[in-house]
From Swiss-Prot:
Keyword Membrane (UniProt): no
Name of the molecule in the record: Hydroxyethylthiazole kinase
Protein's job: Catalyzes the phosphorylation of the hydroxyl group of 4-methyl-5-beta-hydroxyethylthiazole (THZ).
Pathway(s) the chain acts in: Cofactor biosynthesis; thiamine diphosphate biosynthesis; 4-methyl-5-(2-phosphoethyl)-thiazole from 5-(2-hydroxyethyl)-4-methylthiazole: step 1/1
Disulfides per UniProt: none
Annotated binding of substrate, by residue: M45, G194
Underlying gene: thiM
Pfam families to which the protein is assigned, alphabetical: HK (PF02110)
Family statement: Belongs to the Thz kinase family.
Necessary cofactors: Mg(2+)
Molecular function in Gene Ontology: ATP binding; hydroxyethylthiazole kinase activity; magnesium ion binding
Positions of ATP binding: R121, T167
EC number: 2.7.1.50
């Protein structure tokens, strides 16, 4: 897997304009929709249990994000996820804050038990808590801790029969057999709420057009990281507000050529 190979997926997303169904949290809904639109995908935010199964059945990908967790949304996620499975629509799960509370952790473990996942994406603490491995967490954005990130990712991929994506200073993608590290991105991403949640939805757009989910995830992470680097180069001295706006611009303007030029990936 090389930069030229993954760069082609960016063009495919823009040519295909995939429909990404998001059941996400109230903090990030607007940013997620705008980010997907900038990229070239078509977002839909449908939450009502009366319609989620139908909407999921016609989507290119379904993204389940449990950031602002409520029982009615969990019910909707399960209905949508099972419909997506029946209709061969890939499901992505973002277990935001898994490990922070007992209820949140219970839901984070219940959803993968009920729904076949194409991708699970979170920080190291979240993924570790989903698979019941010890990892300290403080708040929903905690990611630092003691442990081997690659090992946790591989264990999650094996136990959940999915592609595991752990994001942080370096990003890890694995299906348990193939493991790739991506080293693109910028620290200012942590100063804008919703950048991790948007990332999961961006991976959804890539998964909708590329059935090799490892390749799709690596392409999405590299694209996202390069876009962040280009945006930061123009705005980092101004601050996170300016960065957020420019990041949306770069999601629209970052090309496959930029991926080939700036992408930093390593197969391990």
């Amino acid at each position: 897997m090389n930069r030229k190979e993954i760069s082609k997926v960016v063009d495919l997303v823009r040519e295909s304009n995939p429909l990404v169904h998001n059941i996400t949290n109230v903090v990030v809904t607007n940013f997620t929709a705008n980010g997907l639109l900038a990229l070239g995908a078509s977002p839909v935010m449908a939450y009502a249990k009366e319609e989620v199964a139908e909407m999921a059945s016609i989507a290119g990908a379904l993204v389940l994000n449990m950031g602002t967790l409520r029982p009615e949304e969990v019910e909707a996620m399960l209905l949508a996820g099972k419909s997506a499975n029946v209709n061969n629509v890939p499901v992505l799960f973002d277990p935001v804050g898994a490990g922070a509370t007992s209820y949140r952790t219970e839901v984070a473990r219940h959803i993968p038990a009920e729904i076949e996942l194409a991708i699970i994406r979170g920080n190291a603490a979240e993924i570790a808590n989903v698979i019941n491995e010890r990892w300290e967490i403080k708040g929903v954005d905690a990611g630092a801790g003691n442990g081997n990130v690659v090992s946790i990712a591989k264990q999650a991929a094996d136990e959940l029969n999915t592609v595991a994506v752990i994001t942080g200073k370096e990003d890890v993608v694995t299906d348990g057999q193939r493991t790739i590290v991506i080293r693109n991105g910028h620290p200012i991403l942590t100063k804008v709420t919703g950048t991790g949640c948007l990332l999961t939805s961006v991976i959804g757009a890539f998964v909708a057009v590329e059935k090799d989910y490892v390749k799709a995830a690596v392409a999405a992470l590299t694209f996202y990281g390069v876009a962040a680097e280009l945006a930061a180069a123009k705005t980092v001295e101004k601050g996170p507000g300016s960065f957020q706006i420019e990041f949306l611009n770069q999601l629209a303007n970052t090309t496959s050529g930029d991926i080939e030029k700036y992408g930093e990936i390593e197969v391990i």
